[in-house]
Amino acid sequence: MGLAQQKKEVLFVGNSYTYVNNLPVLVEQIALSLGDTLVHESSTPGGSSFSAHSTNAQTLNKINQQQWDYIVLQAQSQEPSLSPGYVNANVLPAAQVLIDAIESNSLCIEPLFFMTWGRKFGDASNCVPYPPVCTYLGMQERLRTRYLDMAFMHNASCSPVGMAWKKSIAIDSTLNLYSSDNSHPSIYGSYLAACTFYASIFKKSAVGSSYWPTTIDSVTAYSLQQIGSSTVLDSLAVWNIFNAELTFNQLGDSVSFTNLSSNYESVVWDFGDGQTSTDENPTHTYAQNGTYTVILTAITNAACLQDSQTVSITVNISTAIEQVKAPKQLLQITDMLGREIPFRKNIPLLYRYEDGTVEKRIYLDQ
């Protein structure tokens, strides 16, 4: 993950959870303060579901307007948490229509599902027919599961805003992320969402941003930056965010590499010695001592997107044959049958010592 300045163009598709407190502008301002650029547009009619967006001319026209870097998809706040029967009949087919529209525009666009938060006291209107949503935690768990299902189903990413909220509430339940209706976000909730989106889109921490709304104090802003960023960056693979990552195990001149990348289609390994591989988890043996720069490149979205991780491998194998010096008192040298013979090269000999130990040696012509 590089820290270079980036420019991303993003379309936000959602409803009031996105437009209250102008979430896209909050993300834009955080990015600007950290040297990055977010260009954005929105289609966020109040209360819109995925089904409504799937037939909304404005939404579909904006999807096709240009080759976006990301298109954020936020469902109506309750619908992904409802019963499996409802979700399968209403949410998933509409999400498929939106994904199809995105892919019809360009396979290079990355869909980014907006995992929202559970209502403060659960979903009272759906509690009786579907008890899992009776509480905040129950509703949050259903939202988490369904948004991740959709992300993995469509090889898309997920911005885990709801899980950042859960983490914040666990740390300090007195910081009210909700507005007075216990559903929509307060400015604290929207700022936390913005920090989470910044980390999801740019794959960089929002910690250190000099921007926060004037109604938030600096200590609280810093805490929300930490929570949003760590929720994303500590678990990129969990949220299916495209990322190149590797680990390795070295034994002498042989190195076994393990690919830990997420949401990728293919990988290319450059071992730094002129050799490459497209294997998932290759093992490579170096012919000479030296320090090698190994680059793993992960590729996705019809080869439009690439990410890389670089590690340094040092090989230092001694090739010298050293004379073994025995401080012990030598009694005799024998062949392998125990017959005493004078010292010879190129054949195995047994060295018998006064302390009763026996060593097998062979000395080679240099």
Residue spans for each PLM region:
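Residue-level detector of functionally pivotal "anchor" positions at catalytic/ligand-binding pockets or at interdomain
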Residues: 240-250, 304-341
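Conserved SGNH/GDSL esterase-like catalytic core that processes O-acyl groups on lipids
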Residues: 7-11, 17-98, 107
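Surface-exposed, flexible coil segments in extracellular/virion-facing regions
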Residues: 264-284
